[in-house]
A protein has these predicted regions:
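Short, Lys/Arg-enriched N-terminal segments with co-localized hydrophobic residues
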Residues: 9, 13-30
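Conserved beta-strand hairpin/beta-sheet module of binuclear metal-dependent hydrolase folds
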Residues: 32-95, 183-186, 190-194, 284, ...
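FMN-binding flavodoxin-like domain, especially the glycine-rich phosphate-binding loop
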Residues: 204-207, 214-253, 257-260, 301-316, ...
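Short acidic active-site motifs
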Residues: 117, 323-328
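Active-site neighborhood of phospho(di)ester-bond hydrolases with catalytic His/Asp-centered motifs
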Residues: 78-80, 102-110, 131-133, 192-195, ...
Length: 425
């Protein structure tokens, strides 16, 4: 914490050691936080997290791994937290409850940021039943080995009584975003433990959406959807329709990352429904990289021309090598069209653009238009390469393009209005 402002970065192992030292010196512990009724949050807020899924997802405002403790006639633990924090998680949980009083554990998802403390807690209570999907058994045993745990496989519509007139109802959420994913609905208190769905990588000490910075909350929610869930939008639409068809009441939606939706919880469901419909706003995103600034000049001229022809259209311009790739992809998600540029290098395009286009392809955007541009000195293949990759990524690529020999001049710039007119049709 002391060295972060000076620019030092730590490995995960170093962060764990540092935090354990902090606990010894200062006696800190993460107390439970009340959610509703007999439900508490017992997770971990990670203010220092900088990336997720390796370095594939940038974390700008911290994150959390949310686990929940239900204490009705039966005591239930909903999910655990990430592996590096597993010992602290279990020790802190012991301060809140006798672990032997836990009647069963619900594993909504087998990924290690949710199941990473299972091995440690099961060492303490090895016979405790674990409720999860059949695919979750495979993913959990695949990661941690076959340990003879007492798995109880559930599917959509299955339920378990937890006393006081309440029960947990399970809903499979296959490919949102793993094959093993599910959500758990608690009757009586009307809480949906949605796991990764409806989450954000966002640290909120106060837990709830109505206590969070609304601008950051909305920014992180759409970033999460755009960069993680977009490929699964068709499945998401079907799953939302299925859940709505259950005619359930939602007082709280409690995801496994970020803020808990307490105030108007259906707002995030409505946003997901809109985002799943091949979402786009009146926006165009220009993404490029450059060698000697010629491609930059074209990018800026295209932005100016879009504004001239369509003043209400939002235009975003990013140098891919300098901008955060997840932020750029969020803007692509919001856009009706994109324009991608690269100079020619080694008969192809810059590696920064090539890698970004591969990520673009993975997200499976639909119903978006695209155009290409770039400078060259000799053979000039970059535009054709860009067009082919954009088509492969599912974009409707227009024929108009800008290929500039050496540095762009007025003759090149004179082609831009035609490109923009075609792009905005």
């Amino acid at each position: 914490l002391i060295y972060r402002p000076l620019g030092f970065k730590f490995t995960v192992e170093a962060k764990v050691c540092y935090y354990q030292l902090y606990l010894r010196v200062y006696g800190g512990k993460r107390m439970r936080k009340h959610v509703k009724g007999n439900v508490s949050w017992v997770g971990y807020i990670d203010w220092e997290l900088e990336s997720f899924h390796g370095d594939d997802y940038s974390i700008m405002n911290g994150s959390s791994q949310n686990a929940y403790l239900i204490e009705e006639e039966k005591t239930v633990l909903i999910d655990t937290i990430w592996t590096p924090h597993r010992f602290d998680f279990v020790e802190n949980l012991k301060k809140e409850i006798d672990l032997k009083k836990i009647d069963f554990i619900v594993a909504n998802h087998g990924e290690c940021d949710h199941s990473g403390s299972l091995t440690t807690i099961m060492d303490e209570i090895p016979d405790t039943p674990i409720y999860c999907t059949a695919n979750a058994v495979k993913s959990i045993e695949g990661q941690y080995g076959k340990r003879g745990w007492n798995f109880n496989v559930v599917k959509t519509g299955d339920s378990v009584d937890i006393g006081n007139g309440k029960k947990l109802v399970f809903v499979e959420m296959k490919m949102l975003h793993w094959p093993d994913s599910m959500a758990t609905y608690m009757t009586g208190d009307n809480i949906l433990f949605s796991n990764d769905a409806f989450g954000q990588h966002f640290a909120v000490e106060e837990l709830f959406n109505d206590k969070a910075d609304q601008c950051l909350l909305n920014k992180e929610a759409i970033k999460y959807y755009a960069n993680i869930l977009t490929p699964f939008s068709p499945l998401l639409k079907k799953k939302l329709a299925e859940i709505i068809g259950f005619n359930l009441t939602f007082d709280i939606i409690a995801p496994s990352h970020g803020a808990i939706w307490r105030e108007n919880p259906l707002q995030i469901v409505e946003k997901y429904a809109a985002w799943a419909e091949d979402y786009q706003e009146d926006q165009v995103t220009i993404a490029y990289d450059t060698m000697w600034e010629g491609t930059t000049k074209i990018a800026h001229k295209i932005a100016e021309e879009i504004h001239r022809q369509s003043p209400d259209t939002v235009v975003k311009v990013f140098n891919i090598s300098k901008a955060d790739k997840n932020d750029v992809m969020t803007e692509v998600f919001k856009s009706k069209a994109i324009v991608v540029g690269s100079p020619t290098v080694s008969n192809s395009i810059l590696s920064s653009v090539a890698g970004w286009l591969e990520f673009l392809k993975q997200l499976k955007f639909k119903k978006k238009r695209a155009a290409a541009f770039g400078c060259y000195g000799w053979s000039g293949e970059s535009v054709k390469v860009l067009q082919a990759k954009l088509e492969d990524a599912g974009f409707e690529v227009i024929d108009e393009n800008i290929r500039s020999l050496w540095n762009p001049d007025d003759q090149d710039f004179d082609q831009i209005p035609g490109l923009v007119t075609s792009l905005l049709k």
